[in-house]
A protein has these predicted regions:
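Long, low-complexity, charged/polar intrinsically disordered regions in eukaryotic proteins
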Residues: 1-21, 46, 55-96
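Long, low-complexity, charge-rich intrinsically disordered regions
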Residues: 1-36, 66, 91, 109-116, ...
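Residues within the helices of the helix-turn-helix
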Residues: 36, 47, 122-123, 141
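Alpha-helix C-caps/helix-loop-beta hinges
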Residues: 41, 70-71, 146-147
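Short capping segments at the starts of secondary-structure elements
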Residues: 41-45, 117-121
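A short acidic, leucine-rich amphipathic alpha-helix
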Residues: 48-52, 124-129
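Canonical helix-turn-helix DNA-binding module
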Residues: 57-62, 131-141
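Donor-sugar nucleotide-binding helix/loop cap in glycosyltransferases
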Residues: 84-115
């Protein structure tokens, strides 16, 4: 009878350990999948991770929090914590700032337009983007505050603000370096191909 009890205890212990291993494997699998998505699309937002992973909101939140606490990923919270973007822990902070702006559709359009034309007026940007003047002004302010563009004033008869990219080399390097992650953005791909041909 003692042998049966001992064998039962051993087998229960084995199943407990096996269950723990299975749970750890599942945890590692989910973490690996999330890290892969973040590596493939630096600057990805929570909703996109939710869609790609197929996880429920609570489960994704749990895993993202663990990855962030263990410093396997970086969470960049901007705009009073309204916008969070996720990055691999090996991406320099200067690049995360640029990527965050490029991932925003309106700001990406504005940045690429200014890159192509060296400097532009607000009206030229409005005409190109076909967005409301207030929308363009708001995004230009964000780009200026984020250190992406600077404002110059031409000294002609009619003084105008000109918007110019502040660090041409850094922005074009990021566009080129992360070209694959911007694959769905046709306009970025066209621009990087032009830059590579020069």
């Amino acid at each position: 009878m003692k042998n049966v009890v001992a064998a039962s205890a051993v087998s229960t212990s084995f199943f407990d350990n096996n269950g723990e291993l299975e749970e750890e494997d599942r945890l590692n699998e989910v973490h690996s999948k999330l890290i892969r998505y973040i590596n493939e699309q630096p600057g990805i937002r929570y909703r996109e991770l939710l869609r790609l992973s197929g996880l429920s909101n609570g489960v994704l939140s749990y895993h993202i929090t663990n990855l962030e606490k263990s410093r396997q990923i970086i969470a960049d919270r901007n705009n009073n914590n309204k916008i969070t973007r996720y990055y691999s822990n090996n991406i320099p902070i200067e690049e995360t700032d640029i990527i965050g702006h490029i991932r925003n559709n309106a700001e990406r359009q504005i940045i690429l337009f200014i890159l192509e034309h060296d400097s532009c007026t607000c009206n030229e940007i409005i005409e190109y983007t076909k967005k409301a003047p207030s929308t363009v002004s708001w995004h230009l302010k964000r780009l200026k505050d984020g250190g992406m563009v600077s404002v110059l004033y031409n000294t002609g008869r009619c003084q105008q603000r000109l918007y110019k990219v502040r660090d041409f080399e850094s922005i074009t390097n990021v566009l080129s370096k992360y070209k694959e992650s911007f694959a769905s953005y046709t306009i970025v791909n066209n621009y990087t191909e032009i830059m590579e041909d020069l």
